């Protein structure tokens, strides 16, 4: 007899919308099953090898029988001291390794657990739009309500941020930021964080900053840390992950520093949820942070070369995207002839007709629907192949004459 009982519903899960990236991922896999060669720019998943000295350290320490037990939720003391030295050497910022630093299982876990530890049902959280999905949905999962603050060209972000603080009820408890930005590659200077900290103190709002792309910077630019602002630790914490800087995405290790109360809150909830990450991974992370940083510069240089090929090729096709000065992404405004499609349908079109997979901007928030995101995870030959596919699509649509390399519509 068929089970006629209604399907169980789970309120926390029901608050999450369908994951838009799954749509393009499923279409990509279906195309590959049909034998189609899809150039994949969709996910920011580093394709390079982890530097050998880090792998060797992991293997060496993993041979020791005393490293296979439970670790500690805060992270081993040696790694926390290495984190403190990293901030001192890089930003001239003192971090107390005992009370102001905690190791996380990648930044995504740390962000989600921090929000679960500190947000109550009905709390208001301010998040730029567009933004990295965990910044939005970590708060939603924790039971908070998210108020979007437009982070788009032509809009004064701080005017919108202050208006959101004044007009929100209940008063916002937290704002979540990430620069250099995923997905937009937008960068800010230290003055931006000075204004954020001043605003946060004025209105008693906590600040969480995600510094995932601190090292993926180009053309001599350097990414500031919010912790460089005097008094930032009164209201702010900052996350860093080794995923991008050291090609360690699958290793799942990062850290959070800053406000002692927030560090303590994250440590408390992690003491219930986990025993920290595998000790040999933490020792390898020390080797990463304290070893020769030429490997980090080499990884950034590889992304720069890919960026240059992609942007040059898109410009040749008349798709006048902006040249990012940081991150591993190109945030591309949809060309005007396709603008009415929206980002999801345009991403489907690129997949079907150009054999190029990108992330639709709508997946990062409503204000992202005018753009698609390219992740620089394919080599330069594959990027050139993608450009040929995009040009072929433009030609088929009458936007690029067969005898010309350029289209002349306004794609800004």
Swiss-Prot record:
The modification N6-(pyridoxal phosphate)lysine is found at residue 244. It catalyses: L-alanine + 2-oxoglutarate = pyruvate + L-glutamate. It is an enzyme of class 2 (transferase). Pfam families: Aminotran_1_2. Its EC number is 2.6.1.2. Induction: Activated by SgrR and modestly repressed by alanine and leucine via Lrp. CDD domains: AAT_like (cd00609). Homodimer. PANTHER family: AMINO ACID AMINOTRANSFERASE, GLUTAMATE-PYRUVATE AMINOTRANSFERASE ALAC. This is Glutamate-pyruvate aminotransferase AlaC. It comes from Escherichia coli (strain K12). The gene is alaC.
